[in-house]
Structures are given as structure tokens and as C-alpha cells.
UniProtKB/Swiss-Prot annotation:
InterPro entries: DNA_mismatch_repair_MutS, DNA_mismatch_repair_MutS-lik_N, DNA_mismatch_repair_MutS/MSH, DNA_mismatch_repair_MutS_C, DNA_mismatch_repair_MutS_clamp, DNA_mismatch_repair_MutS_core, DNA_mismatch_repair_MutS_N, DNA_mismatch_repair_MutS_sf. PROSITE patterns: DNA_MISMATCH_REPAIR_2. Keywords: ATP-binding, DNA damage, DNA repair, DNA-binding, Nucleotide-binding. This is DNA mismatch repair protein MutS. The lineage of its organism: Bacteria, Pseudomonadati, Pseudomonadota, Alphaproteobacteria, Hyphomicrobiales. The keyword Lipoprotein does not apply. The gene is mutS.
Length: 908
């Protein structure tokens, strides 16, 4: 019996277990465990023993801590107690869910023979076991382990060296839906691309994992990044591996891919094969994404804007939660995908907007579509489980219900003059196999069990043989009732019962005090065969009861066999139509997203944005989509709408920059964020919270609004702010939108002012982007006199009887103060502190009037950044070219000295 113990925190590691000494001293069962564990490094081993999955040694320590389950011991190994813990097989999914959410990987090891078979090989033979599946965060398909509204991507990162710069590429697969995509990337945008796709698991060569340049990326990803042997990413064999998976001789029909993309795709496929053992999920053909096709949003911006989750990790309070009106799992995932990857192609964006506009104009049709969509199950995930032999009767029902709903939606749309996107969706629905829905409807019962092994999922009439077997089973129940009555009358024991359990099968049970008529005579003893005596009862059987039990057991076995054969036939019919089912499911998701965004637009009074290839950014009556809804829920009054116009001024080709000043609590940060969110919503193809909006395509969006310490990496708030600002100034183009809030506030006043001043100049002269720059450095407002595309804007306030009222309105002009002392008083600072602060402020303001910033600007030369950029654009110097051409490893010392003199001459 296992005892509760304090085993401590030490146990044999996997490497120590695998030694020859360890194996030699192990029991036969433990030797088997050690061998299987050695073949599955990096995974917790769920080792099946009867009705439990047991974990031993280091795995037991980790699992007991992670799951909060009791740590016990099972014997000793090499003189040390063997730590052990376990989970019941019937509840394994619940424990797997927790382990996977914590980033663990689990190897599921099952008994692949009956213990009776093992005994035939010898009394001490160990039951054969093998790993049937590796469960990892990126390769799960079980409904209980997946979030219906989130994709579950496995991603692979590959690098090919050669040429001036190494090639990097990403491939990502969701085996629960069959999505398979790939794209090239660069080290400078690698983290941004990974976070945009948001994989649950990233595999990469161990050589890249230990690359110092990319280490900061993997530090952010934590346990999501999993190093693998570099051979998995071999580009030479990549094309062949992918072709074999899809059963084709060449990838010519799939499109053109770079070597790095093929290496990443092949590694992802190989990892899927490795984790699924003998099964193959039905993946779609790999689709290539161009980096230029989506709006680039850097990691800091994505976090600051709280697109899918808040900074605390909650979905509530995010933009996605605020705009999600979808009613299907596929629709929710597609909406999230569009939000995280807004487009840069006006034609594709406007096609999405056309769908929303059409459904707004057809409210009755939109309502009927949504009513039908509410009954659509998650067909892609049901299909994947069926293809991987993990499906059940309810997955077949999901396919049947989805096909039925698709037919209803097609009927609703067929007579309408549809815009392009909805017309393509209709074609996808009409291409679904009509006969498959009929087959499933005529075969599946109305009430379905969870597991196919439970039987009872075929309706009466689906199989004549099954009907016959079921009749025998039902008839047997009546026969048993008759036998019970007969035996009671024959013995005179009115309390006699016929019962059943898994050990004895069917048996007759009477109380010990009433058993005499069944035991006193030899005739009675020969008729009622004694099976078991208990404290208060005795159990018997008869020849006819044993015969009946045999017939019932055979009938039940035969019934289940018939049902399982029918299940396999239905599954094969479904999997044969996998491509059309996935296309139809995608069409359902497109309709769901369009209908949901149409409802959102009507409900929240959003407008259709004008999106084109210009550099316009003109928002009238813009609102923050999340804050506005929160105010409405809390009855906090209407949201104050504001205009924002960063469009090129007359005669200028580049967009404008607004320098925004105003008090704390005046609404600056909300105004900054809402304009960034409006740009994202417009380019994802959604109506936006404004009365009108004209947005020229934004290629890159940067938002530095708020910052915090990064203690884990030894970076202060100011350092984090500077790193994020550097990324913006180095990467923003003339098509970018930049949102900056209070740059320079984390250091000394003059240092901060100087940095903010230089940053504004750089944005205006070098980046030439559209931007909003909020600041408390009022000295910066004088820059509008010299920078033609810079305009001052301020958050308006009203002073009344010594108090300040925040109007949350944006207007032209500059604030002359920040009202920080008034805010401090509202926050409850002691009156003496507030009074002293007023006195200090008065003295500082008097000193500032003697040296105003307007004098400073006349003394400072502007546009130096632009001059330096022009110098850089002239190309490398002769010295740089000569250095690049040198092969230093092949030079003699004399040749190196000559080369150095030659370089010195070139400098002259």
C-alpha cells in the first residue's frame, strides 16, 4: 500500500535513470518504465497501471507540485525511495488540461496487452506498454483542453545561413482545425510576428535557441519555446517530407516557398507526426503569408493597446471582448485572427466592409443568419478528432448538425445580391456534400453517448442485424424477470432477487436466514449452485441462468461490434470529405464574423471607414470602443467624442503630427489609444467608433503609452521607455502611425525635455509619419513655429471656484499648465503638502519666465537628423568597401600591415 511521505525535492533525473547501473538494478517493471522514459525526454510520462496513470521519480515531484496531488512512494531504486503520484484514468483529461496550461508536455503510455496475456509468457512477465501519444500545448485536439474561441497553434522557426543575411521563416499549424501557414520574417520583427500569431508552442533548432542575438525573444516566450534537434529542420529533405505527408510527388501545385519556409514547414509536420504517433491530422495545404500584407504591430504596442487581453492577462476589458458578437467557435477564432493581423490591402479591407454594410442594410436577413449560426457546432475540431481516431458519436453529430445549418444558411443567402466576400462564402456552403448529412441523420440516434465504446448511438432501423440483437437483449431482460418470479415461487422465498455485477455476472441473492430451501436437499443443491456466502446473504446460480447470461453477453458484444463498425464507416465517409467540410466551416466563420460586426455597428453606432492608399487620417467624433461600452454598462454618462486629423496639410505629401498637452486625468491616454484602435479596427475590416473616418493605409503602428519596470531583465521604467522609443524611431516609415505618451518623464527634467524634443524632431524630419505625441513638457509647444507639419492640441479644462473640471475635449492650442497639484489634492494629499507644492510651483514658474523656451528654439539648429540620414543614404565609403572585401583569416602579418596603410590613405 502506498503511504503518504515527505519525499523531499530530490529524485533521480532522467539522465541518471538511463545509466547502465540504474537499469541493471531495476525491477522488470521499473526497467520498462526507465526505457520508455528515456525514449521520451522532456515529457512527463503518464504510465498506465490499471485504472491510474502513475508518475515516478523526477516526474512525480514535478507533477505533484503542479497538480497539487499527494506525493507517495513505491519501493526503492538503488537504495532510495521512488517518488510516485498518480491520476485516475477517467479524470485524466482534467489533469492534462492543467499540465498543458502550465506548459508541460506529457507522454501517454498505455498497456497494449491484457495482463492475462502477459502471464502466459511467464509468471513474472511485465505487461507490454508503449507511448500512444505525446500531448503538448501545440498539438491537442480534445474539446475539454481547447478554448473554443482561440486557435491552438504549433509554430516552427527555421533559419538558413547563406548570403549577406540569414533567412528566417515561421510555419504554424493548428491540428484541431487543419490551418497550415508560413511566412518569412527577420530578426528585428521576429518577436512581433510570433506574438501576432500567438502560438501555444514554438519549436526551433537548439542552435537558434542558444543564439545570443535571439535570446531576448526566447526569454519573453518562456516555456512556449522548445528546442529540438537541428536535424528536424534540415532544408535538404524538407520538400520530400512535406510531399510525403500530403501524398504528392511534388509541391509545385502548392506554390513557391523559400528554403527557410520549407525547413520550418517540414519541421512542423515532423513534430506533428512525432506527437501523434500513428495518426495524421487532415491539414490544409500550406498557405504563404507576405509580411507586407498585414499591419505590423510591435510587441509593446500590442500589449499596451490590450487587443486580445488586458495587461493583467484578462480577456474582459480587451478590445476583442468589446467587439466580439460572434456565436460560433470558428467565428470567434476568425475575428481574433483578423484583429491580431489587420490588412494593408485596401481592396481586401473594403471587401470585408462591403459584407458588413450589406448585412446592416438587410437586418431581417442578418437576424435569421445569426439565429441559424447559433446552432452550428465546431465542425473543424470535430473533424480533426474523428480523423485522429479520438472522436466520438457527438463529433459525428457535430458534423451532421453543421451540414444541416450550412444548408439552411445557403437557402437564406441564395436569393440575395451578395457582395464578393459573402458570395464566396455561399459557394463554399453549396459545395458541401449533401448526401453526408442524410447518411448521418438516418444513422445516428437522437440521444448520443460521449464515448463510442458505450454503444447506443445508432438509431433503431439503422441496422437490421443490430435491431435483432437488441431485441434479444431486451427479451433477455424479460426472461430474467420471469426467472426471478419462477425461483421465488419454487423456493417460497419472496425476497429472492436476481442481480448482476462485473465479478459474478448474474446471480440469485437471498438473505442468509432464508437460504434453507436452496441448501437443505441434494436436489436443491444440484439446482441452485452456491457461488458466494456473505455476512447477511448467500448467492447462487443455475444452469439456465448461466446460459442466459452467456446469450446476453454475446448479444451485447455483438451489438457493440456492429455499432463500432458503423462508426468507422461514418467516420471514413466524413474524413473523405475533409477538404469540403473545412471550406464550408471557413465560410460559416466568415458569415458569423460579418453578421457579428454588423450587429456591433448598429448597436454601438459605428460608421464605415473610408480606407484607401492615401496618407489621410481624419477621424470625426471618434470614441474609445472599450471605454465607451464600460461607461454605458456603469451608467457613467456618455463618452466624449473627439476629432483627430493627421492628414497631410495642403501642399504636403506626408501626414501631420499633433503635440498634445493637457492635465493629468484630462483624457490624453484615452484619446491616444482610441485613435490607434480605430486604425486597427478599420484595417481589420470593421466599422469604427466614429461619425466619420478616412484612413489611408498604415503599414506600421507603434504605441508607447505607459511603461513599467522589467526587473527580470534588470531594466528600469525609464530604460524600458527608451528601448521602446528607440524601436519606434528606428522603424517607423512615412506610412506609419506613431502614438507616444510622455516620453522622457522617467528621468531628470532637462534630460527628459531634451530627449522628447529630439524625438519630436526625428519623427517630423526623419520618419515623416503620422503621429500623436502627448507631453507635460509645455516647452515643446514652441516647436510648432518651426516644424511645418506639427500642430498643437490640448485637453480642455474648466476652472471653477478653485477647482478644475476635466472636459475630456480635444481642441487646438497648448496647455499652459498640467494641473498636477489639483489632481494631487483630489487624490487626498495632506493640505500642508499641497500648499507647499503651490509655493514651490510659483517660484519655479517665475524663474522659467526669465528664460522662456521660445528663446531656446532660436538658438538650436533643427533638422540635424535629416542631414545625417541623407549622409547615410549616399552608401558605404571606400574604407567600408575595402574592409568588407578583406579576408582577414587568409592574410599574412605583412599583408595586414599593408592593408592598414592603404586604409589610412583612403581616409585622407
Amino acid at each position: 500500500m502506498n503511504a503518504r511521505i515527505d519525499i523531499g525535492n530530490e529524485a533521480f533525473s532522467a539522465a541518471e535513470l538511463a545509466t547502465a547501473e540504474s537499469r541493471a538494478s531495476a525491477t522488470p517493471m521499473m526497467e520498462q518504465y526507465i526505457e520508455i522514459k528515456a525514449n521520451n525526454p522532456g515529457s512527463l510520462l503518464f504510465y498506465r497501471m490499471g485504472d491510474f496513470y502513475e508518475l515516478f521519480f523526477e516526474d512525480a515531484l514535478e507533477a505533484s507540485r503542479a497538480l497539487g496531488i499527494t506525493l507517495t512512494k513505491r519501493g526503492q531504486h538503488m537504495g532510495q525511495d521512488i517518488p510516485m503520484c498518480g491520476v485516475p484514468v477517467h479524470a485524466a483529461d482534467d489533469y492534462l488540461q492543467k499540465l498543458i496550461s502550465l506548459g508541460f508536455r506529457v507522454a501517454v503510455c498505455e498497456q497494449i496487452e491484457d495482463p492475462a496475456q502477459a502471464k502466459k509468457r511467464g509468471a513474472k512477465s511485465v505487461v507490454k506498454r508503449d507511448v500512444i501519444r505525446l500531448v503538448t500545448p501545440g498539438t491537442i485536439t480534445e474539446e475539454k483542453l481547447l478554448s473554443p474561441s482561440e486557435s491552438n497553434y504549433l509554430m516552427a522557426l527555421a533559419r538558413i545561413r547563406g548570403g549577406a543575411e540569414p533567412q528566417l521563416a515561421l510555419a504554424w499549424i493548428d491540428i484541431s482545425t487543419g490551418v497550415f501557414r508560413l511566412a518569412e520574417t527577420e530578426s528585428s520583427r521576429l518577436l512581433a510576428d510570433i506574438l501576432r500569431i500567438d502560438p501555444r508552442e514554438l519549436i526551433l533548432p537548439d542552435t537558434i535557441f542558444h543564439d545570443a542575438e535571439l535570446k531576448p525573444v526566447f526569454d519573453v516566450l518562456g516555456r512556449t519555446a522548445v528546442p529540438q534537434p537541428s536535424v528536424l529542420f534540415d532544408s535538404a529533405s524538407a520538400e520530400g517530407r512535406i510531399a510525403r505527408y500530403f501524398g504528392v510527388s511534388t509541391l509545385d501545385g502548392f506554390g513557391s516557398f523559400s528554403r527557410a519556409e520549407l525547413a520550418a514547414a517540414a519541421a512542423a509536420v515532423a513534430y506533428v507526426e512525432k506527437t501523434q504517433i500513428a495518426e495524421r491530422p487532415p491539414l490544409g495545404k500550406p498557405e504563404r503569408e507576405s509580411a507586407a500584407s498585414t499591419l505590423f504591430i510591435d510587441p509593446a504596442t500590442r500589449a499596451n493597446l490590450e487587443l486580445a487581453r488586458t495587461l493583467s492577462g484578462d480577456r474582459n476589458g480587451s478590445l476583442l471582448k468589446a467587439i466580439d458578437r460572434t456565436v460560433t467557435g470558428g467565428g470567434a477564432r476568425l475575428l481574433a485572427e483578423r484583429l491580431m493581423s489587420p490588412l494593408t490591402d485596401p481592396a481586401r479591407i473594403n471587401a470585408r466592409l462591403d459584407s458588413i454594410g450589406f448585412l446592416i442594410e438587410e437586418p431581417s436577413l442578418c437576424g435569421k443568419l445569426r439565429d441559424t449560426l447559433k446552432h452550428v457546432p465546431d465542425m473543424p475540431r470535430a473533424l480533426s478528432r474523428l480523423a485522429l481516431d479520438r472522436g466520438g458519436p457527438r463529433d459525428l453529430w457535430a458534423i451532421r448538425q453543421g451540414l444541416q445549418a450550412a444548408g439552411g444558411l445557403a437557402d437564406l443567402l441564395a436569393s440575395a445580391m451578395l457582395p464578393e466576400e459573402l458570395d464566396q462564402a455561399l459557394s463554399g456552403l453549396q459545395a458541401l456534400p449533401a448526401g453526408l448529412e442524410t447518411l448521418l441523420a438516418e444513422t445516428l440516434a437522437d440521444e448520443l453517448p460521449l464515448l463510442k465504446r458505450d454503444g447506443g448511438f445508432l438509431r433503431d432501423g439503422a441496422s437490421a442485424e443490430l435491431d435483432e440483437v437488441r431485441a434479444l437483449r431486451d427479451q433477455s431482460r424479460r426472461v430474467i424477470a420471469g426467472l426471478q418470479l419462477q425461483y421465488a415461487e419454487e423456493t417460497g422465498i419472496r425476497s429472492l432477487k436476481i442481480k448482476h455485477n462485473n465479478i459474478l455476472g448474474y446471480f440469485i441473492e437471498v438473505t442468509a436466514g432464508n437460504a434453507a430451501p436452496m441448501t437443505e436437499t441434494s436436489e436443491a443443491k444440484s439446482r441452485f449452485i452456491h457461488r458466494q456466502t456473505m455476512a447477511s446473504a448467500m448467492r447462487f446460480t443455475t444452469t439456465e441462468l448461466a446460459d442466459l447470461e452467456s446469450r446476453i453477453a454475446n448479444a451485447a458484444d455483438r451489438a457493440l461490434t456492429i455499432e463500432l463498425e458503423a462508426f468507422d464507416r461514418m467516420t471514413a465517409a466524413v474524413v473523405a470529405q475533409a477538404e469540403s467540410i473545412k471550406s464550408g466551416a471557413r465560410a460559416l466563420a466568415v458569415i458569423d464574423v460579418a453578421a457579428g460586426l454588423a450587429l456591433l455597428a448598429e448597436e454601438q453606432a459605428y460608421c464605415r471607414p473610408q480606407v484607401d492608399g492615401s496618407k489621410m487620417f481624419a477621424i470625426e467624433g471618434g470614441r474609445h470602443p472599450v471605454v465607451e461600452q464600460a461607461l454605458r454598462r456603469q451608467a457613467g454618462g456618455p463618452f466624449v467624442a473627439n476629432n483627430c486629423d493627421l492628414s497631410p496639410k495642403t501642399g504636403d505629401k506626408d501626414g501631420a503630427i499633433w503635440l498634445l498637452t493637457g492635465p493629468n486625468m484630462g483624457g490624453k491616454s484615452t484619446f491616444l489609444r482610441q485613435n490607434a484602435l480605430i486604425a486597427i479596427m478599420a484595417q481589420m475590416g470593421s466599422f469604427v467608433p466614429a461619425t466619420s473616418a478616412h484612413i489611408g493605409i498604415v503599414d506600421r503602428l507603434f504605441s508607447r503609452v505607459g511603461a513599467s519596470d522589467d526587473l527580470a531583465r534588470g531594466r528600469s521604467t525609464f530604460m524600458v521607455e527608451m528601448v521602446e522609443t528607440a524601436a519606434i524611431l528606428n522603424q517607423a516609415s512615412d506610412r506609419s502611425l506613431v502614438i507616444l505618451d510622455e516620453i522622457g518623464r522617467g528621468t531628470a527634467t532637462f534630460d527628459g525635455l531634451s530627449i522628447a524634443w529630439a524625438a519630436v524632431e526625428h519623427l517630423h524630419e526623419a520618419n515623416r509619419c503620422r503621429g500623436l505625441f502627448a507631453t507635460h513638457f509645455h516647452e515643446l509647444t514652441v516647436l510648432s513655429e518651426k516644424l511645418g507639419r506639427l500642430s498643437n492640441a490640448t485637453m480642455r479644462v474648466k476652472e471653477w471656484d478653485g477647482d478644475v473640471i476635466f472636459l475630456h475635449e480635444v481642441g487646438p492650442g497648448a496647455a499652459d499648465r498640467s494641473y498636477g497639484i489639483q489632481v494631487a489634492r483630489l487624490a487626498g494629499l495632506p493640505a500642508s503638502v499641497v500648499a507647499r507644492a503651490r509655493d514651490v510651483l510659483t517660484r519655479l514658474e517665475d524663474a522659467d519666465r526669465k528664460n522662456p523656451a521660445s528663446q531656446l528654439i532660436d538658438d538650436l539648429p533643427l533638422f540635424q537628423v535629416a542631414v545625417r540620414r541623407e549622409d547615410a543614404a549616399r552608401g558605404p565609403s571606400k574604407v567600408e568597401e575595402a574592409l568588407r572585401a578583406m579576408s582577414l583569416d587568409d592574410m599574412t602579418p605583412r599583408e595586414a600591415m599593408d592593408a592598414l596603410y592603404d586604409l589610412k590613405k583612403k581616409l585622407k
